[in-house]
From Swiss-Prot:
This is Ribosome maturation factor RimM. Belongs to the RimM family. Residues 1-22 are annotated as: Disordered. The gene is rimM. An accessory protein needed during the final step in the assembly of 30S ribosomal subunit, possibly for assembly of the head region. Essential for efficient processing of 16S rRNA. May be needed both before and after RbfA during the maturation of 16S rRNA. It has affinity for free ribosomal 30S subunits but not for 70S ribosomes. GO terms for cellular component: cytoplasm; ribosome. The PRC barrel domain binds ribosomal protein uS19. It comes from Cupriavidus necator (strain ATCC 17699 / DSM 428 / KCTC 22496 / NCIMB 10442 / H16 / Stanier 337). Its main location: cytoplasm.
Amino acid sequence: MTERKQGAARPLNRPLVQPQGEPQKACKLPAALLYADPLPEDLVEVGYIGAAYGIRGWIKVLPHADDASALLHARRWWLLAPPQAGLVAADASRAQPVCVKIAQSREHSGTVVAQASGVADRNLAEALKGRRVWIRRADFPAPEEDEFYWVDLIGCTVSNEQGELLGEVSGLIDNGAHQILQVACVLPDGKAGERLIPFVDAFLRSVDTAGKRIVVDWGLDY
């Protein structure tokens, strides 16, 4: 989540630490955990499984954001295996999506630990290590006033008060003090460029995530 005034939280989908690609434990995943249906279209990556937690099948998730409220709020997680090069004759179940219902979850020393139905022992929890955690956008908690989820800002057109199109939001940067919109644009010479616009009240005039429009006090020549 990002807040337009302070912007202290990192965007939800910006990885802080990447998994190191360690081989997973040789534990076949139960068929009941594998997800064969088409994945929901509104899935958002919110973290990855860093380790097993305890001996009763709990998993430890490293969130991609300081604010883990969306991860804690969702009761169903999709666990997708990251691309891994060099695996020969790997267990096919490793690559299949896993869908789990979360019985309980809580924050723990900068991580989120969770108990997933169907994951009953440490060996099975370790077999999930490295998988990315995805949840549906529809399962995010409602943001506070003047707060926005970064995923809702991506793809918004950005224009100024004069009606001049500045570009389209392609990403966000957290400089520690506030968020900065990365706005993809076309330069006068026809080449692709980028504008960096602080996501703060001094420059923001309106944000319409439903209409995918942002209006800012910003000139074409800035």
